[in-house]
Regions:
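Short, surface-exposed glycine/acidic/tryptophan-bearing loops
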Residues: 1-16, 79
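Non-catalytic cell-wall polysaccharide-engagement segments
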Residues: 15-138
Length: 138
């Protein structure tokens, strides 16, 4: 079964986190998503001083794509002298994972990946976030 509810949580993720109940219930769904996002951020081991915007974008990409593909992109960034904590650099390498040559690089563990949906997801969430912030600050 596919993603469910407001935060589009996969049922298998709910099981992994031991969360039962109705995933279409907004409160249950959002609470589970918060747990998932928090676990993702903690597991990424960002360098001190990593800007919150970069953190947010990288975590959102993990939430959407699965952490493995983003870890690959961060490994590629690190290997080729880019910043694995910069969304600009990580998104560049994430988009390159659709290339079979890049996907076969020794830094890649999770194979090829078409990142277009994930990159759009991150852009859309961040644009909505900016809109909400600007409306709230009025």
């Amino acid at each position: 079964k596919g993603a469910m509810g407001l935060m589009q949580v996969m049922p298998r993720v709910a099981r992994q986190f031991g969360v039962g109940g109705d995933l279409t219930d907004p409160a249950n769904n959002v609470l589970l998503a918060i747990k998932v996002l928090s676990k993702i951020e903690k597991s990424l081991d960002f360098a001190p001083g990593t800007p919150s915007t970069d953190r947010m974008q990288i975590v959102l990409a993990c939430y959407n794509a699965g952490i493995g593909h983003v870890l690959d992109a961060r490994s590629l960034a690190r290997k080729y002298g880019a910043n694995p904590d910069s969304w600009a650099d990580v998104s560049t390498y994430l988009s390159r994972k659709s290339d079979p040559e890049v996907a076969s690089d020794s830094a890649v563990k999770y194979g090829r990946f078409n990142s277009s949906q994930t990159l759009s997801f991150v852009d859309n969430v961040c644009a909505k976030y900016q809109t909400y912030c600007s409306n709230f600050s009025r």
